[in-house]
């Protein structure tokens, strides 16, 4: 699973997801892509599940680029813990995704195979997405 090697601070504020994505919303590497249509936190497990599903379907033919990286730690308090005594410990990492963000790119395969591979990856995502073709 993806996670930063080291961070400046162990814990972060939750923040809020307003507006659309102005960065990372164009296809850069491949020919076909999966684009987010809703804002969400996508966990490193979900990113890896989508990548594996695409890789398994496309086999050796295509190349896959993962365009998001989970750089935000999410803290969770232990079960049945009383309020107070500080913030919980970091449990997992998420990537903050806004509408318009490209999640995955794929190239080197036909459009029908790319559509099928990306639809499998899209089913692993917790948000609505769309298939995009470069150009």
From Swiss-Prot:
Keywords: Chloroplast, Plastid, Ribonucleoprotein, Ribosomal protein. CDD domains: Ribosomal_L16_L10e. One of its GO terms (biological process) is mitochondrial translation. PROSITE patterns: RIBOSOMAL_L16_1, RIBOSOMAL_L16_2. It is found in: Plastid, Chloroplast. GO terms for molecular function: rRNA binding; structural constituent of ribosome. One of its GO terms (cellular component) is chloroplast. Its main location: plastid. Part of the 50S ribosomal subunit. NCBIfam families: rplP_bact. This is Large ribosomal subunit protein uL16c. It comes from Piper cenocladum (Ant piper). The gene is rpl16.
């Amino acid at each position: 699973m993806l996670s930063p090697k080291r961070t400046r601070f162990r814990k972060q504020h939750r923040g809020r997801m307003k507006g659309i994505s102005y960065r990372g919303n164009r296809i850069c590497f491949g020919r076909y892509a999966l684009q987010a249509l809703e804002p969400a936190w996508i966990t490193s497990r979900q990113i890896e599940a989508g990548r594996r599903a695409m890789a398994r379907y496309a086999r050796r033919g295509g190349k896959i680029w993962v365009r998001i990286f989970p750089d935000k730690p999410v803290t969770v308090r232990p079960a049945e813990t009383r309020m107070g005594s500080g913030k919980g410990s970091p449990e997992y990492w998420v990537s903050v995704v806004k509408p318009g963000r490209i999640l995955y790119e794929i190239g080197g395969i036909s459009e029908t195979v790319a559509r099928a591979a990306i639809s499998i990856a899209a089913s692993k995502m917790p948000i609505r997405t769309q298939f995009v073709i470069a150009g």
